[in-house]
């Protein structure tokens, strides 16, 4: 009589633990100042008809911050709104064999925000388990003809959907200059490992400190996911 088979393995899927976060940032000009402030503080500030706090001051929209200026002639710049940016969308895949290069020509920018990520990140074992994986990217600037690594980034975790992250590059070279993204991790050659990488966009940032004299304003920053992304 033959031996019975071993106990069947039930595949285990690790939880997704990578989540993109995008902040919505806006300044709203209320009118000519000076005027009185919000009657009920943050409860008086509505986003999609939803107040930032309830009557007891507890957050209704988590992660939101707001600043207020009444419209004085000598008012200070709103904190957290000291820069403006122009985003250029790319959405291009980055492979080990083909780094992606772009040229920056804008003369007056102070910094660059580089947004990149993975289409998904998961490794499936021979037993069907779906586990976290990792992938490494280099973000480089060309300085005096040489490629210099400014950021060495490893994305480590699991996600079955797109995940994006951002880094800021300061101390930029004289314009024009080249920027490139290099994939250090070998490209996957099997469906068992999903780790395609992409360069989503770059944002040219100019540092500004505007006071908006004689204008009453509200500045709001909130996680875009609170309103469907």
What spans do the regions from the language model cover?
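Polar, S/T/G-rich
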Residues: 1-229
